């Protein structure tokens, strides 16, 4: 096919496995750039691409569509706060903590790292955050640090009041947070990256490996390993754990944190704090209360229709369901996976099916490495609530990790549409 040379170019330059995002999406980007560059056809555009570094970058920008928000996977930031205090004590003032967000996209993740550590009581001189991305436009937007509604998701948005000023065009991040983060353009496939940047105590590289083929995954992992201090912690995406397990890393053992350390016997990774005593960097996201779905229950769990109940009973039932959902979130965020799972089952036995409960069951199974159970639960969540944002994102990542790239792509497109609609 005429497009194959462009696919090879993207693989060589940024490691992209085109099938992971879908050939049609890349083909649309090619058509857009052909028009923008004034090329007569793909052959003409190929010649222009070879002769212009600016056009090469423009094509990469057209293909990359950032999807991120503040405090995505909040349990990772809770774990970071506890681990960072331990690591800082080990350093005993020798140097500040070093953290890396790669890719940093439009800045939500590296700024979340800084806010989490501030919330954990750390002074500005105690840590430094680096953010790197291959996209100059994303890095430029991160530098502006002005964000719209889509960057703030979930119901726990207290950090926005603490660290942002409201503007007509969105919310601007406080200078205090911005000064903690250094941003730059860079490529994770750059072989000089590790030697140039030294070692990091914490590296956040989430939902990147799943877009690469196996050889590129290995190359990227070797770079990450060189960047990471022997006692450091690598935070990844939910569906990438099996990849790291094959590459000599092991989970740290903090539920839903997706934190991994080296499996080598000569390293002494940070011990995970007991979940019940871990100091939180911020209040973790409670389970949102979603509208009750109008699907029939199995006969064994049939409940009295809401319309037939007295008003007081309906009110009491709603409050009980909300309290149970909040309790599930607290247990899961505290790492009490078995108790959280038990409470999910209790909810399903007492109340109508809930997309959020099935999402929690999926995430618990995902964290424990049970991919098939996770798939089943995520799909049930989406049956009940087709636009459930977290279920869409997690199921897409899981399908991509299993090689179902077409299915993952469809879910990614649904998630992107849902995100756009939420901004209207």
From Swiss-Prot:
Single GO MF annotation: S-adenosylmethionine-dependent methyltransferase activity
UniProt keyword annotation of Methyltransferase present: yes
SMART domains: MeTrc, TPR
GO BP: methylation
Enzyme class label: transferase
InterPro entries tied to this protein: Bact_Chemotaxis_MeTrfase (IPR050903), CheR_C (IPR022642), CheR_MeTrfase (IPR000780), CheR_N (IPR022641), SAM-dependent_MTases_sf (IPR029063), TPR-like_helical_dom_sf (IPR011990), TPR_rpt (IPR019734)
Superkingdom assignment: Bacteria
Oligomer and partners: Monomer. The TPR repeat does not mediate self-association.
Annotated protein name in UniProt: Probable biofilm formation methyltransferase WspC
């Amino acid at each position: 096919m005429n497009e194959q040379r462009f696919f090879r170019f993207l693989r060589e330059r940024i490691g992209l496995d085109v099938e992971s995002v879908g050939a049609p999406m890349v083909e649309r980007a090619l058509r857009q750039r052909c028009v923008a560059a004034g090329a007569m056809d793909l052959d003409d555009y190929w010649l222009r691409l070879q002769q212009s570094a600016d056009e090469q970058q423009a094509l990469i920008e057209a293909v990359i569509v950032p999807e991120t928000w503040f405090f995505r996977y909040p349990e990772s930031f809770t774990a970071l706060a506890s681990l960072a205090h331990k690591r800082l004590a080990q350093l005993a003032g020798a140097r500040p903590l070093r953290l890396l967000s790669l890719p940093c996209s439009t800045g939500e993740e590296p700024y979340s790292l800084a806010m989490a550590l501030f919330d954990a009581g750390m002074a500005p001189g105690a840590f430094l955050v680096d953010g790197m991305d291959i996209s100059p436009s994303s890095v430029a937007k991160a530098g502006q640090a002005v964000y719209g509604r889509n960057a703030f998701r979930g119901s726990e948005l207290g950090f926005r009041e603490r660290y942002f000023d409201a503007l007509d065009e969105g919310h601007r991040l406080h200078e205090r947070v911005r000064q903690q983060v250094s941003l730059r353009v860079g490529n994770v496939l750059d072989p000089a990256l590790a030697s140039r940047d030294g070692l990091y105590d914490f590296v956040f590289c989430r939902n990147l490996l799943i877009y690469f083929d196996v050889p590129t995954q290995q190359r990227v992992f070797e770079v990450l390993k060189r960047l990471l201090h022997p006692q450091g912690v690598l935070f990844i995406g939910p569906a990438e754990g099996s990849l790291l397990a094959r590459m000599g890393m092991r989970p740290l053992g903090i539920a839903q944190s997706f934190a991994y350390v080296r499996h080598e016997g000569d390293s002494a990774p940070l011990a995970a704090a007991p979940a019940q005593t871990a100091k939180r960097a911020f209040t973790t996201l409670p389970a949102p209360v979603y509208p009750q779905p109008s699907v029939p229950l199995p006969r064994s769990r049939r409940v009295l229709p809401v319309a037939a109940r007295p008003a007081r009973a309906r009110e009491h039932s709603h409050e009980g369901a909300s309290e149970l959902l909040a309790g599930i979130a607290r247990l899961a965020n505290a790492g009490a996976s078995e108790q959280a799972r038990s409470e999910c089952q209790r909810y399903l036995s007492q109340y109508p099916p809930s997309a959020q409960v099935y999402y929690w069951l999926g995430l618990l199974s995902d964290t424990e490495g049970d991919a098939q159970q996770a798939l089943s639960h995520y799909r049930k969540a989406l049956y009940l609530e087709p636009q459930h944002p977290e279920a869409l994102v997690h199921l897409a990542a899981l399908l991509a990790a299993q090689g179902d790239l077409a299915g993952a792509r469809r879910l990614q497109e649904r998630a992107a549409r849902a995100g756009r609609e939420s901004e209207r």
